[in-house]
Amino acid sequence: SALPPLPEEATENTPEGAEAFIRYYVDVANLAHQTPQLGLVPQLASDVCESCVTMEQQVSDLVAKGERVEEPVYQIDKIEPIGGSTGGVQLFNMNVTLPANRILTAEGAEASSYEATEISGRGGAIWEGDRWWVYELTLTP
């Protein structure tokens, strides 16, 4: 599965680079749900990112059922860096909206729908091997 091009700013080992990478990850996560593709999320996930494993499982469920999500699943409302990074990890306070959405069958019929939800918490990226990886997204209602 081919990833969309990584924005130039997401290649920099700076807090701004980490933020650009997290935003890119959310774009890829949306793509993975709207045109269900396995293998996109793991290409960006660190070995310790449990939420990344959960997200790939959600995509796997869509693929298995032949379903897709109609609109982007995640929308970042706020992302603010927390202090300095330690051990190559840059953390952020995040607010994310999951807009009201529909899950569609392969034929385009509505399989299910859900109301909008706001989640918040921490996200983080870790710099390893000359690039960013998603460290963790711990976001809850």
Task: Give the ranges of each region predicted by the language model.
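Exposed beta-sheet edge and beta->alpha loop/turn motif
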Residues: G83-P141
